[in-house]
Amino acid sequence: MNNNVDYKLMRLTSSKCSEYFEAMKIYTQSVEYIQKTSTNEIKYWIDHFKKFALGDLFFFVLLSNDIVIGYAELAYIKKSRTLLIDYIAIDKQYNSNSAFYSFYWLI
């Protein structure tokens, strides 16, 4: 039995990739309604991240042994050289300190 966990970070640059749908499931199940950004708006910005005038947008999925277990959304504001972490969401089934801190450090 192999208990090794291999975490990988993958940047989302298109809403057409299969990982996007898994990430949105995790996002909608993990984030409270009042704090949620519309998934249509997230989809738009994933597909048009280069149009963000203030800096750079980043959308990531966390993979554990090639299974999508997390989603993160960040913005880098060039003028103030500030990195904002908007969301870090991890599937409840995989939610642990190991998964969270691995995701955080990979970002």
PLM regions: where:
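Short amphipathic alpha-helix that is part of the acyltransferase structural core
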Residues: 1-47
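Short strand-loop junctions, especially beta-strand C-caps/beta-turns
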Residues: 10-13, 88-93
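Residues that form or flank phosphate/diphosphate-binding pockets in enzymes
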Residues: 18, 80, 98
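Short loop/turn motifs at secondary-structure junctions and domain boundaries
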Residues: 49-54
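Short loop/turn microsegments at loop-to-beta-strand junctions
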Residues: 57-58
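Conserved beta-strand in the GNAT
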Residues: 61, 66-76, 82-89
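Conserved acetyl-CoA-binding loop-helix of GNAT-fold acetyltransferases
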Residues: 90, 95-107
